[in-house]
Amino acid sequence: MTSIDDAPQRSAAHDAVAEVLRGHIRDIPDWPQPGVVFKDITPLLATPTAFGVVIGALADAARALGATTIAGIEARGFLLAAPVADRLGTGLVPIRKQGKLPGPTRSASYDLEYGAATIEIHADAVHDGDRVLLVDDVLATGGTAAAAHSLLAAGGGEVVGLAVLMELSFLPGRDRVAPLDVVSLLTI
């Protein structure tokens, strides 16, 4: 598994991407609940040059992994996956919360700290031979990413990796999505 931020031989380009992220992610303490520090990416989204650098790095990761399809997890994953797919000329698979997609769907459920959640894709979104890169903003506990991985694989796609802006290394996300390759532009 890979993390650009903590790879043994980081390149200057990787360091530059991590620095761009550090300069464009805002900490919001005690949101959405006391004790949580929310990582707000809206400053990144509001800065076209910084956003372009990050999308370029994610697109480079997709190319390196041989992705032929990009899948984005609702909601902030959509903001990253769509421009990556556009830049690469690939299709985009939106992974939505249950009940948000019309027509036949495939679903996968996963446990949350208190309760459960379900995500869905269109039944025909992934095909045999598709090499899918899963894209999201943050890898934390890994529950959503693991469910998305199983959902895409059940549809016939080969999930070639998970690419995220940032990984919260103090949480078990990387272990939960193993053996997927994880490309993290910034490890916190």
UniProtKB/Swiss-Prot annotation:
Gene3D superfamilies: 3.40.50.2020. GO terms for molecular function: adenine binding; adenine phosphoribosyltransferase activity; AMP binding. It is an enzyme of class 2 (transferase). Its main location: cytoplasm. It catalyses: AMP + diphosphate = 5-phospho-alpha-D-ribose 1-diphosphate + adenine. Pfam families: Pribosyltran. The keyword Cytoplasm applies. GO terms for cellular component: cytoplasm. It is found in: Cytoplasm. Pathway: Purine metabolism; AMP biosynthesis via salvage pathway; AMP from adenine: step 1/1. Keywords: Cytoplasm, Glycosyltransferase, Purine salvage, Transferase. GO terms for biological process: adenine salvage; AMP salvage; purine ribonucleoside salvage. Its EC number is 2.4.2.7. Catalyzes a salvage reaction resulting in the formation of AMP, that is energically less costly than de novo synthesis. Homodimer. Belongs to the purine/pyrimidine phosphoribosyltransferase family. This is Adenine phosphoribosyltransferase. It comes from Frankia casuarinae (strain DSM 45818 / CECT 9043 / HFP020203 / CcI3).
